[in-house]
Amino acid sequence: MDGVHLGENLEDKDTEFTWEVKANDRTYHKQFKKKGFLCWRQKKYKSNAIHTAKYNIFSFLPLNLYEQFHRMSNLYFLFIIILQGIPEISTLPWFTLFAPLVCLFVIRATRDLVDDIGRHRSDKIINNRPCQILRGKSFLWKKWKNLCVGDVVCLSKDSIVPADLLLLASTEPSSLCYVETADIDGETNLKFRQALTVTHHELTSPKKMASFQGTVTCEEPNSRMHHFVGSLEWNSRKYPLDIGNLLLRGCKIRNTDTCYGLVIYAGLDTKIMKNCGKIHLKRTKLDLMMNKLVALIFLSLVIASLLLTVGFTFMVKQFKAKHYYMSPTHGRSDAMESFFIFWGFLILLSVMVPMAMFIIAEFIYLGNSIFINWDLNMYYEPLDMPAKARSTSLNDQLGQVQYIFSDKTGTLTQNIMTFKKCCINGCIYDSDDEHGTLRKRNPYAWNPFADGKLQFYNKELESLVQGRQDRAVQEFWRLLAICHTVMVQEKDNQLLYQAASPDEEALVTAARNFGYVFLSRTQDTITLVELGEERVYQVLAMMDFNSVRKRMSVLVRNPEGSICLYTKGADTVILERLRSKGVMEATTEEVLAAFAEQTLRTLCLAYKDVEEDAYKEWEPEHQEAALLLQNRAQALHQVYNKMEQNLQLLGATAIEDKLQDGVPETIKCLKKGNIKIWVLTGDKPETAVNIGFACQLLSENMIILEDKDINQVLERYWEDNVHQKAFKMMTHHNMALVINGEFLDQLLLSLRKEPRALVQNAVVDEVAQEPVVSALDFLQKRRISQMWRNAGPSLGTSHSADSKIRESPEVQRERAFVDLASKCQAVICCRVTPKQKALVVALVKKYQQVVTLAIGDGANDVNMIKTADIGVGLAGQEGMQAVQNSDYVLAQFCYLQRLLLVHGRWSYMRVCKFLRYFFYKTVASMMAQIWFSLVNGFSAQPLYEGWFLALFNLLYSTLPVLYIGLFEQDVTAEKSLKMPELYMAGQKGELFNYSIFMQAITHGTITSMINFFVTVMVSSDMSKAGSSHDYQSLGVLVAISSLLSVTLEVMLVVKYWTLLFVGAVVLSLSSYVLMTSLTQSLWMYRISPKTFPFLFADYNVLFEPCSLLLIVLNVALNVLPMLALRTIHRTVLKQRPKGEEEAPSEEVAVEPAMRHLRRGIPARRSSYAFSHREGYANLITQGTILRRQTHVDDSDGGTVCESLNPPEEDIPLQNKDSVFNPRKISILAKKRRHFFGKGSQEEVHPNTSSQTMEKQPTIHRDSETQKLPTTTSATSGKLLPSASEDEAFYSVASQYTLASQPKHTDVHSSFWKSPLWRDSASSSPSQLEVPRKQS
């Protein structure tokens, strides 16, 4: 399946540790050979040169011919040409097929050669990149292709790693090396690699590196991107190696001046190249159908030839019986005569397979590719990047795409994080400078440390900061300046932040602009400049992010000696750790929901003052847990959790992860065209889901299924396999899947032969000591069980029970998963490797039999791009590997809309019309050969002149059909984009299929019968009246009638008339007149009477009025009935009742049975991409990661993060069995918890809200004190209740009702829309309006 074998090649099989690399010893590696093709032996250690091209000078001709003859039509034509070379059976001149076939081969070979030259150029650019290689005792600049295994390489900042290297040393402390892996796994965050301590201390100069003679023994080259095991033997000692010591090819060196590495894998042996599948010849659905149709036509011609041969045999027997005296003149037996006449008929009818159609199709594909290249609407001016069709044979398939598989990083997003809003003490602060007008006047002029690039500015908030009266505001910005792992450097008297995440950098920069400047840090201190005053905080403990905690905390002692804990994290873990939950906390939670509705990435901030005695009691426990050798992570987690209780909420931040321009609109439009979009990313689930909401791939009313839920669905799928209905419930609901790479391994590998240890080894980033919790625990079991009760017995397989039994367990599992996923509106696959991306695409292709498109911009997308039917590479993002292996190149994701809905749909429609008309006109003209055989004694005598047979499809009727293939339009480009529903015709194959093919054949057969038999009958009467009636006149009359009939037919089917089309028709008919005048001239007859036998045949016929009238009669009989039928058909369609025409489908008409599963209130999504493994806090506290103050860098950074739900011990006992158990309901699939407090233990009745609606309090900022007033009931003094809309599922009442927020609280209040909550008792809305994203 296009380079991906299901399951078996998900990860490479366990390999022996037989790969030995000796430093600085090329001779050692050259002696090793491995078995190659047949008896050839090749080098075991490959060079670093890569070759993505298919051909070279010697292999081009044989390989290209081999690919050409994969087409059934070419084999057929070659076979007929061979037969034509036998004089005894040849019935047509040799040039009728030989010249067109040669022309076809030359055109296709030229196209393939041009495409491959482009690949050679791309390979040359990469292979000739420079790098420094150790030669002797110094480093010399060499090309990448000259790099060999065992070489020592020197890399500088911002350079790309040329091969898989073992990090030996770097200029950073402890030989750390920061790399960006965006071109490998799609993540723009910074990851660090570290050299062994022994190499860090010993290899300190080029001279010592030249004397380095260590030997690395490791696993054979494989595709496991996150796994590496080996050992270094040096000076009679062995040192263990893992993936943390390896720099992978394609990584970019960041924040590191210089590093040194030993080449372990080179060229095609590198992990990124192992993840790139082989180049396969992609064939369109129409191309594959054409192979079948050619075989069908050939079979039909064989049958027709057999029947005509039978007629010939019967006729010969009758003739010999009647004229027995002529028998001695026949030297051959009847059987021999029949044998020769059969092949004669086969050659005669070979013109029924139109070779010219394949030639013209090449020009059509080329022309449509040029139109894509010329489309200025897909030209990206900032990069001077037009769209480019690198493949010219897939244009029609662009109009049949049903699944799009998209990368996230760099494809959907720009990877630009912007601080957009914040909420402090329950008050929302938006930016006063949305359009950048204030930044021109430098509103932060009072702050010398301010970063002018920050787009967020709020004058009121600035006044609060400078007033120093509101502690919540001060602690808010102080927390952002302290609680992080950002590194700081100074360059040209400017502070440069090197963050592990763009999120963190945005937060710290925002604090910096508001006067709380992170200045520097040491192993146990952090220095801030707070409103011009320098303050040093002692770091007592740094509680880092991991995959379970979903939060980060820093315990510090301020200069006054007080201890304070600062915590930031996901709202689901922060809110449940608050000391109390009052109105301000409730307001903040409502604001979080509003931010989430605007697809902003939110983060909660909280703090608490810690008593000295409490710290002294906690610190020994912390030290003891930190010194454990076993279960250290679990012990630290428990200690951290003990400290992170009774917090005081400060507020929340909102960060925008910028999408590329037009992404939401593009996805919305494509979904209207019935195109399903799957996101396959190596990034974290939280990040991917946030982007899913931002780009409108996911919506708030979707039912989102994750790993555990899918397993339950699939189990029921297998149990109920006796049912014939396939996922009926899924068609009525808006559902989505969010799954991770580990789940894919478990799902698709659990029943295969590979050991499970292989799957476990593939995910080495996981913290083994952490509690095992699903990364996305979206839905609780109650929802799933209720789903099955509603679904009943309707959920089954689409295949019969018998076929299901015959399938292997792994095939059943794969089919069940694909069937489930295909019923969902969206699928997001997170943490997937490049090979897993290709596997998902291959699974859909195998079980759904649909056209797939993959789009990406990095090397991690190459395998997916190659596996899909159509590969689209985005240029200018993460290198050129995706572009080099793609079929089409775009600069922006939004251009995909025009590529598919305009160029793709047009190309498909044009090719379909072209094929239908070409088959029709071929049969309409050439079927007369069969009818002529019926009246000429089955003699295999051709009816037409040989030149007419050779030039009819190649010249006489070519230009009109070429116009259809290049310029035909049913609607304009603008209407194609406005009506994406038109695209569904291509997905269903409505414009050309076997039914339409048979219609074209039937129509052509009727046309040929009219042209031939009417001509024969009328000519008989004409001969009785004294007009000439001979064989050549009959052939000319039928030929002219056929030519005019098919020309008028194309004039009827063309919808887009231009002067160019009129010129094409005139030129085609003129070419017939000119060529016929030449081939039937006396001059050509004298040269070769055998080749030009029709002397003045057209002249003799056309100068007879009866012949002209006969031609008009034939054309009228062919055209007028079809014109009448089309007119009647269009009239009936126009008069069809509107209700009948727009009747909804069964899927749309059916009311969903599970409304309570929908999320009526938007869930919050955390702004932080939580770490998939431990963060960098331990390195900071150890001093390992800290930089020298003199070091300067200006590079960007990123992070490695992931989010998991809190462990069981973090959940309050009263909530463990509740529907609000956070382990059961994730931030993506749950309603917000309405019980807010421990403050009131009294029962709140639902009718309270209806009694007090008239006196709802107002939540606002007091202009003087800036405090949030207490909100109580006017009648009872209790907090006002509110209930959720979804009472069928959530029945816990709220403790309060939010009132309106004054207009002055948000400078963009005009953009605020309807409230998120409504009172359950009275349907009147609450008056708190929350801002939505500006349109």
Swiss-Prot record:
Q: Which residues lie on this side of the membrane: Exoplasmic loop?
A: 96-295, 361-917, 968-995, 1055, 1126-1335
Which residues does Mg(2+) bind? 407, 409, 857, 861
Q: How does it sit in the membrane?
A: Multi-pass membrane protein
What are the entry keywords?
ATP-binding, Cytoplasmic vesicle, Endoplasmic reticulum, Lipid transport, Magnesium, Membrane, Metal-binding, Nucleotide-binding, Translocase, Transmembrane, Transmembrane helix, Transport
Residue ranges annotated as compositionally biased, kind Polar residues, are: 1246-1255, 1266-1276
| Example GO BP | phospholipid translocation
Q: Which GO terms describe its molecular function?
A: ATP binding; ATP hydrolysis activity; magnesium ion binding; phosphatidylserine floppase activity
Q: Where does the record say this protein resides? A: Cytoplasmic vesicle, Secretory vesicle, Acrosome membrane; Endoplasmic reticulum membrane
* Sites where the protein binds ATP: 407-409, 504, 545, 568, 601, 681-683, 831, 837, 860-861
Q: Recorded E.C. number(s)? A: 7.6.2.1
Stated family: Belongs to the cation transport ATPase (P-type) (TC 3.A.3) family. Type IV subfamily.
Output this protein's name: Phospholipid-transporting ATPase IK
Native species of this protein? Mus musculus
Q: Which gene encodes it?
A: Atp8b3
